[in-house]
């Protein structure tokens, strides 16, 4: 079969399967791939191809992840599936696989299990915005009431973590039966795909968001003023627009009087581009690496936040020994390191390499941040952990 041409015309959405071990995440991934390829065209991936997840490195952290793609009539999906629980934890915390929505797989034969809860909590902490439930192995449960009970339990568990448990879609199906070509169960996979299309809104593209550029370098150009350089993270900056300089020091306002790229003058700089931005009336010593340029009023500097952190194992080049409360490493945000102190959850005395943990961080100077911002934890330039801002305190 000829490979379908990748169409840029369809909106692109990132999703993934989450849930307890052996509840059928990988089987469901294979079933979606097969049923959608059969129904709408495309290439089907087998269970064994997906299960044999290649090893990747994200910020020095080893993660096993399978990536597959599939199409519905209106969208193109990129879907991630991980073999082990630890891979999910690392994936979600580093943002290696940023999900616009997740498919929570729960076996009807078991109901919600410890990792079901943990993956829902992680989704909440790292900011996965939407969850759809696929109740799997429903062919093995004869009792209609039991299925209703499991569905109710899952909905309550999601509500507990502030997802709209009463309103989100729950599809009862059997991934294995669908994979074996049973038409009735294949219909449930189509139903799941339709739920993805209708329930997960089209993600806002980086270019449509409010302008933000982390400052990497500062130069003064005689007769012209101060130029800051960096890669535009989101949005568009046009010549003549007001910008704020946020982080480290007090926030100040200035105007963009020029945009340069590869020594050419432009009218604007866009998300993904490396630009130099000329700032009106700003002195060279008033800006520094680690600050951000942003559209006024869209991002604030903060020093204290709750985070979800994965601590690198010794094998990944992390610490060989645990750390305790009072630990003072550097937190690397976007372009710079800031020293901070940590508070561990009650009853936690120490954190071992390879653990994931919730911690409250207090930085010695403020950094421009939103919930969902990723950071690295470093000691003398060496990465020992990865984290995500879950909740801003002050």
UniProtKB/Swiss-Prot annotation:
Binding locations of Mg(2+): 26
Region (G1): 19-26
InterPro entries: EF-Tu_GTP-bd, EF-Tu_GTPase, EFTu-like_2, EFTU_2, G_TR_CS, P-loop_NTPase, Small_GTP-bd, T_Tr_GTP-bd_dom
Residues where GTP binds: 19-26, 81-85, 136-139
Molecular functions per Gene Ontology: GTP binding; GTPase activity; guanosine tetraphosphate binding; translation elongation factor activity
UniProt catalytic activity: GTP + H2O = GDP + phosphate + H(+)
GO CC entries: cytosol
Alphabetically ordered keywords of this record: Cytoplasm, Elongation factor, GTP-binding, Hydrolase, Magnesium, Metal-binding, Nucleotide-binding, Protein biosynthesis
Region (G4): 136-139
Residue ranges of domain tr-type G in the record: 10-204
Enzyme Commission code(s) on record: 3.6.5.3
Organism superkingdom: Bacteria
Region named G3: 81-84
Annotated localization: Cytoplasm
Stretches the record annotates as G2: 60-64
Region listing for G5, in residue ranges: 174-176
Pfam families per UniProt: GTP_EFTU, GTP_EFTU_D2, GTP_EFTU_D3
Role according to the record: GTP hydrolase that promotes the GTP-dependent binding of aminoacyl-tRNA to the A-site of ribosomes during protein biosynthesis.
Protein family according to the UniProt entry: Belongs to the TRAFAC class translation factor GTPase superfamily. Classic translation factor GTPase family. EF-Tu/EF-1A subfamily.
Summary of subunit composition and partner proteins: Monomer.
Protein name (database record): Elongation factor Tu
Species annotation: Shewanella amazonensis (strain ATCC BAA-1098 / SB2B)
Phylogenetic classification of the source organism: Bacteria, Pseudomonadati, Pseudomonadota, Gammaproteobacteria, Alteromonadales
